[in-house]
Amino acid sequence: MNPAPKKPSLLFSSLLFSSAAQAAGEDHGRGPYVQADLAYAYEHITHDYPEQTDPSKGKISTVSDYFRNIRTHSIHPRVSVGYDFGGWRIAADYARYRKWNNNKYSVSIKELLRNKVNGNRTDRKTENQENGTFHAVSSLGLSAVYDFKLNDKFKPYIGARVAYGHVRHSIDSTKKTTEVTTILHGPGTTPTVYPGKNTQDAHRESDSIRRVGLGAVAGVGIDITPNLTLDAGYRYHYWGRLENTRFKTHEASLGVRYRF
């Protein structure tokens, strides 16, 4: 028996196996995926309320700077569904943020008039009560990301994101002013206090707004298995001008991505 005719067959099989292995290697990482993240968000909210005296509004605003420029933070989950093209990735994500709410009360007393002879005086008492809430109800985004393959494990990435956001915010601010006159009757006696005129100004506002905003994403992916990747990322998102409110977030996240 002559084994020579089997050599081309063995050579063909080897080439076919090598080509299949190479193709499998090239296709590694491609396909649909899901990702779950836990994000820490720094939120900056700027409100353009009327100034203390604004003739165009025809009223007095009692909103203090405390509620005009809010800096807060939250921790929230985020889920994504996307497709990996072997370099480029496209994903849709959804997130809900924690509701921010706070209140502030302040009181001040200013002496308006004092009689130097008998010590009688008139004071003005000003009370401010402010209650504010802000809630980024939801964010539905679409991002395009490019992965830089440094080696078989580490893949830094950078990309852009566009998102449709829903925001609710409200403010309830009341300023109450009371003038009080104190009459002294002499040493060892109880003075008489006469409440004077009261004035009260209020500013109330509540909005529910939806707007499309733009942002950027960056991070690094670490392959744990051929299908499982640990993702550490950062994203910046400017939600746009929401009527009289500007809102932007900086987020750091840690999550896992699974490719099917």
Swiss-Prot record:
Q: Where in the cell is it found?
A: Cell outer membrane
Q: Which residues form a coiled coil?
A: none
Q: Which UniProt keywords apply?
A: Cell outer membrane, Membrane, Signal, Transmembrane, Transmembrane beta strand
GO: which molecular function terms?
porin activity
- Which InterPro entries does the UniProt entry name for this protein? OMP/PagP_b-brl, Opacity, Porin_opacity
Q: Signal peptide location in the record? A: 1-23
Its Gene Ontology cellular component terms are: cell outer membrane
Described purpose of this protein according to its UniProt entry: Implicated in a number of adherence functions. OPA proteins are implicated in pathogenesis and are subject to phase variation.
Q: Which family does it belong to?
A: Belongs to the opacity porin family.
Question: Under which name does UniProt file this protein?
Answer: Opacity protein opA58
Species per Swiss-Prot/TrEMBL record: Neisseria gonorrhoeae
